[in-house]
């Protein structure tokens, strides 16, 4: 299928495999070559490689490979990407270690640490036998690689505070039904980069800068100032001088990923997002900090290297391809031999 765009972008989904999996995809934006992925799967339908092409020719710039254990957990992950400006190489050569199904250690064997700030890659910040810990509910409570010393959870198993070893912390506030209402960032300016829309002020601790985001329905406020109004297919901002609304719209792919953001005011492309399998952002993405809603339309938080997608019920890490907490509905089974297809005539 072809999805044409008013701004000269197209998305082409390659022929599907007999099992329903997609064998490849092509995409292109104005002024860019045609980019492609060709997918390979194992006998259980799990993605084993994504071969990358530009203008129909094989390229090793964004190649990825995966292997799994018998329970479906990723054992190894190899990912190439942007290391420096116009220089590409292997950014992630990861091996995973588990305690049952709980990920306890990730080691990055890649030779070079990418210096390109917009690239999304795994930061191997520790070398311990156990780098991640969990509570009795299966929620991750610390991550030494990310310098996270403690993650605290509320009664709904939603993260309410993330503490870092440099003294920084992130606080979450929710409504009674678990809907996120506010995020407060207390960041050490000497060890963390502040958000692009930073309006922070010094808080009680002279080392920390405080900034915050509030969510009121479809309105998003940053430091008490209306930042955007979320609408179907995009969002609205306001001109600082005239206070007139400016409409921005997304061009999505077949998964609902926001690939392109277009300003209705003049029709120019404000943002281009290129995605790895599992939702990570490629280094060739343009103006990727324009707005935070990316993979499957979910909000990406890159503050202090967090790199988590907020799916509402829980958070997802696209760099490792792992969730940070249990699925609340994982044990809510139907009384049927076949659960996923919701059968009616085969019910027991």
Q: Residue locations for each model-derived region?
A:
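A cytosolic small-molecule/anion-sensing beta-strand core signal
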Residues: 7, 155, 254, 317
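Cysteine-centered, disulfide-bonded loop motifs in secreted/extracellular proteins
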Residues: 11, 72, 138, 256-258, ...
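Short turn/helix-capping motifs enriched in Asx and small/polar residues
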Residues: 265-281, 304, 312-314, 318-345
């Amino acid at each position: 299928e072809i999805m044409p765009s008013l701004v000269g972008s197209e998305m082409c989904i390659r022929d599907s495999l007999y099992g329903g999996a997609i064998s490849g995809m092509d995409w292109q934006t104005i002024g860019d070559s045609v980019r492609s992925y060709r997918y390979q799967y194992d006998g259980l339908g799990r993605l084993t490689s994504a071969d990358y092409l530009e203008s129909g020719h094989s390229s090793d710039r964004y190649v990825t490979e995966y292997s799994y254990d018998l329970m479906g957990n990723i054992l190894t992950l190899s990912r190439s990407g942007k290391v420096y400006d116009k220089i590409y190489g292997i950014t992630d050569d990861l091996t995973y270690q588990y305690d049952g199904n709980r990920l306890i250690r990730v080691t990055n064997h890649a030779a070079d640490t990418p210096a390109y700030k917009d690239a999304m890659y795994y930061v191997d910040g520790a070398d311990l036998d156990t780098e991640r810990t969990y509570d009795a509910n299966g929620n991750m409570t610390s991550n030494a690689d990310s310098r996270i010393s403690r993650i605290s959870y509320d009664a709904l198993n939603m993260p309410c505070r993330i503490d870092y070893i440099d003294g920084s912390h992130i606080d979450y506030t929710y409504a009674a039904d678990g809907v996120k209402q506010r995020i407060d960032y207390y960041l050490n300016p000497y060890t963390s980069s502040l958000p692009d829309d930073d309006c922070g002020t010094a808080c009680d601790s002279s080392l920390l800068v405080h900034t915050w985001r509030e969510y009121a329905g479809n309105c998003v406020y940053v430091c008490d100032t209306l930042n955007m109004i979320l609408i179907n297919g995009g969002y609205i901002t306001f001109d600082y001088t005239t206070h007139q609304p400016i409409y921005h719209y997304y061009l999505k792919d077949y998964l609902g990923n926001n690939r392109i953001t277009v300003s209705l005011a003049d029709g120019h492309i404000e943002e281009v997002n290129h995605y790895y399998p599992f939702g990570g952002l490629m280094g060739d993405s343009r103006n990727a900090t324009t707005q935070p809603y990316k993979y499957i339309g979910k909000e990406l938080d890159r503050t202090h290297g967090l790199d988590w997608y907020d799916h509402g019920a829980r958070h997802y890490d696209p760099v490792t391809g792992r969730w940070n907490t249990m699925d609340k509905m994982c044990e809510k089974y139907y009384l049927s031999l076949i659960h996923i297809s919701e059968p009616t005539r085969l019910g027991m």
